[in-house]
Amino acid sequence: MVKVTFNSALAQKEAKKDEPKSGEEALIIPPDAVAVDCKDPDDVVPVGQRRAWCWCMCFGLAFMLAGVILGGAYLYKYFALQPDDVYYCGIKYIKDDVILNEPSADAPAALYQTIEENIKIFEEEEVEFISVPVPEFADSDPANIVHDFNKKLTAYLDLNLDKCYVIPLNTSIVMPPRNLLELLINIKAGTYLPQSYLIHEHMVITDRIENIDHLGFFIYRLCHDKETYKLQRRETIKGIQKREASNCFAIRHFENKFAVETLICS
């Protein structure tokens, strides 16, 4: 019978060989640690896709910011813009059935009729806003009028019909804002006696304007949500003019040293 024995010294030496050295650290890895940092490939978002989403978010925020700025500017202009001066005054003019060579302060008061209106002047924007209240004459309509010297346009809003009419600005009749402001100051101070004559201008309605955005801020504000039409001017004469058509309405106003009757016919 043979007895097999092991050298204990040799076994201890081999065991020591497998042990880490005193200056080294032993790394113990748990069995389930292999899959800790692994992810499902379907859950991984490509870098390019993340970058595209980032750009979309940036552009969306930029558009929202631009909309807020533009909307705020529009609301400020719509609600906070105030005219430089507001006047409520009138002008006297000779009746159509009376002929005088020149208006005179000595003429009897019965020979004159009076137009009163509310005038707002935006001198910096070169815009005049005229509000004609319900007149004492049955043959004239109340209206709001905008003269925009930047756009070179005039717009009439007939308050009886609730319709807008646009025509190129007639600078031979309409005073520039600064000159009109001086005239109103003189009338208010009493240095100018507003007794004058009546000018007739005859307009014909032509095409309907579907989009009024290009007509400028002030005309847009006047005519927004209103039926808006173009006008064509026939002729402007001083004195009496016979009304050719029954389908007409008149707006009497002034923005000069004389009164104007704007006759608009379909």
Swiss-Prot record:
Lumenal side: 76-266
Tissue expression profile of the protein: Ubiquitous. Expressed in brain.
SMART domains: BRICHOS (SM01039)
Pfam family, one: BRICHOS
Keyword Signal among UniProt keywords: no
Chain ranges on the Cytoplasmic side, renumbered to this chain: 1-54
Annotated glycan sites: 170
Record region (Necessary for interaction with APP and inhibitor effects on APP processing): 102-134
GO biological process, one term: nervous system development
Record GO terms (molecular function): amyloid-beta binding; ATP binding
Transmembrane regions listed in the UniProt entry: 55-75
Disulfide bonds: 164-223, 248-265
Residues covered by the BRICHOS domain: 137-231
InterPro entries in alphabetical order: BRICHOS_dom, ITM2
Gene Ontology cellular component annotations, sorted alphabetically: endosome membrane; extracellular exosome; extracellular region; extracellular space; Golgi apparatus; Golgi membrane; Golgi-associated vesicle membrane; intracellular membrane-bounded organelle
Family note: Belongs to the ITM2 family.
Biological role stated in the UniProt entry: Plays a regulatory role in the processing of the amyloid-beta A4 precursor protein (APP) and acts as an inhibitor of the amyloid-beta peptide aggregation and fibrils deposition. Plays a role in the induction of neurite outgrowth. Functions as a protease inhibitor by blocking access of secretases to APP cleavage sites.
Record's disease association: Cerebral amyloid angiopathy, ITM2B-related 1: A disorder characterized by amyloid deposition in the walls of cerebral blood vessels and neurodegeneration in the central nervous system. Cerebral amyloid angiopathy, non-neuritic and perivascular plaques and neurofibrillary tangles are the predominant pathological lesions. Clinical features include progressive mental deterioration, spasticity and muscular rigidity.
Official protein name in the record: Integral membrane protein 2B
Gene: ITM2B
